[in-house]
């Protein structure tokens, strides 16, 4: 999150905050990135400047004022659609119009909204070398089993990992699914501010998307190896506005690199009087990594699950083998979990029951 420190840039940032940003969300049938005559425009898609959230009108159009603490505009990717790593735009000086093309992506979403997704975390790679095997295994499984999306909850990690990982695993490489990334403590690296490189490669550190009857929210870890520019207040104020457009019929699942501060009532906010009551909003689960273990716990007071997943690349410190977690979400947002081991090549064994 780029918060301008140099006095010489304050003027342009002020103008950015005062700008009116407009655009449309549309189904890009020919995938040329342009809104062509006859292409469908999508109604009621949330669009945000990092603070304010609006929804597109019947013509697929939106208008936002801009926010000085966020250099992006981004959409809540609607269910049944995907973008090729482009659910966001970095705001450019002098440009005020940003159209968002989306493509149909119904694979893995059943008629009742139920679906499956894959959770990975803490891959902590140093480069592409030595990682293609587990990535291919993950991608092949996703394609064969019609997985709705893959989510990585951070620690990609350090400069070398951040630069390499996006080339190994991204939405453009997969035909009928998509991948979303979150930021971990080891993804806050040296630069003008901790999340600078992550933003350059992966986009905003908080955002949301819809799949079936579930609203998914990615949130950033609040501390790390280097100081981030974003604050909990930034995340809270955006999340509050984001959830204002989520109907009561939808369940909510939150992603983060670690556990929330409040694992009793799951209230996310600034104080005892200013917070979001996530269970009251429909929170079903909080998925995270960080601890390099596999752990599932249902909290008695709220019924919310906290689900930790280790790395698919080399196993966990709990001696768990390399694996990725497959989660099934039913029409009411209830979650079931299973594991699939990494590095397993396809094989067929023919046996005789008589011998």
Where are the language model's segments positioned?
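Extended active-site neighborhood of metal-dependent phosphoesterases/phosphodiesterases
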Residues: 78-83, 90, 103, 163-246, ...
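A short, solvent-exposed beta-strand micro-motif common in secreted/extracellular proteins
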Residues: 52-53, 68-82
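Active-site glycine-centered loops adjacent to acidic/histidine catalytic or metal-binding residues
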Residues: 122, 154-155, 184-185, 257, ...
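A short C-terminal boundary segment appended to hydrolase-like catalytic domains
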Residues: 328-355
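Short, acidic Ser/Thr/Gly-rich low-complexity loop/linker segments typical of extracellular
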Residues: 29, 35, 41, 48-61, ...
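A short, amphipathic beta-strand motif
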Residues: 21-27
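Short acidic, glycine-rich surface-loop motifs adjacent to enzyme active sites
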Residues: 246-264
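N-terminal active-site segment of His-dependent metallophosphoesterases
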Residues: 29, 90-164
């Amino acid at each position: 999150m780029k918060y301008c420190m140099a006095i010489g840039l304050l003027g342009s940032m002020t103008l950015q905050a005062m700008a009116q940003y407009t655009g449309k969300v549309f189904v890009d049938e020919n995938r040329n990135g342009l809104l062509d005559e006859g292409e469908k425009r999508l109604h009621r898609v949330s669009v945000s400047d990092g603070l304010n959230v609006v929804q597109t009108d019947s013509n697929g159009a939106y208008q936002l004022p801009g926010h000085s603490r966020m250099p992006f505009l981004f959409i809540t990717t609607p269910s049944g659609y995907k973008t090729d790593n482009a659910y966001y735009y970095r705001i450019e000086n002098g440009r005020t119009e940003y159209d968002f093309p989306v493509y149909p992506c119904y694979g893995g979403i059943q008629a009742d909204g139920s679906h499956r997704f894959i959770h990975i975390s803490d891959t902590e790679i140093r480069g592409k070398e030595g990682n293609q095997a587990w990535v291919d295994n993950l991608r092949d499984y996703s394609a064969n089993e019609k997985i709705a999306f893959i989510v990585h909850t951070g620690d990609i990690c350090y400069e070398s990992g951040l630069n390499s990982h996006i080339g190994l695993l991204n939405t453009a490489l997969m035909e009928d699914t998509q991948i979303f990334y979150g930021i971990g403590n080891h993804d806050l690296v040296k630069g003008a501010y901790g999340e600078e490189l992550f933003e350059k490669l992966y986009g905003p550190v908080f955002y949301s998307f819809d799949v079936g009857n579930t609203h998914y929210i990615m949130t950033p870890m609040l501390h790390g190896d280097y100081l981030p520019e974003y604050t909990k207040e930034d995340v809270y104020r955006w999340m509050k506005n984001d959830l204002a457009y989520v109907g009561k019929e939808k369940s909510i699942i939150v992603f983060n690199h670690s556990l929330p501060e409040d694992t009793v009532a799951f209230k996310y906010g600034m104080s005892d009087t200013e917070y979001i009551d996530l269970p009251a909003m429909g929170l079903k689960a909080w998925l995270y990594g960080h601890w390099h273990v596999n752990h599932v716990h249902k909290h008695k007071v709220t019924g919310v699950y906290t689900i930790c997943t280790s790395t698919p690349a080399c196993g966990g410190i709990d001696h768990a083998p390399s694996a990725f977690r497959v989660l099934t979400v039913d029409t009411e947002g209830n979650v079931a979990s299973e594991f699939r081991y990494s590095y397993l090549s396809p094989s067929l064994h023919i046996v005789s029951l008589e011998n």
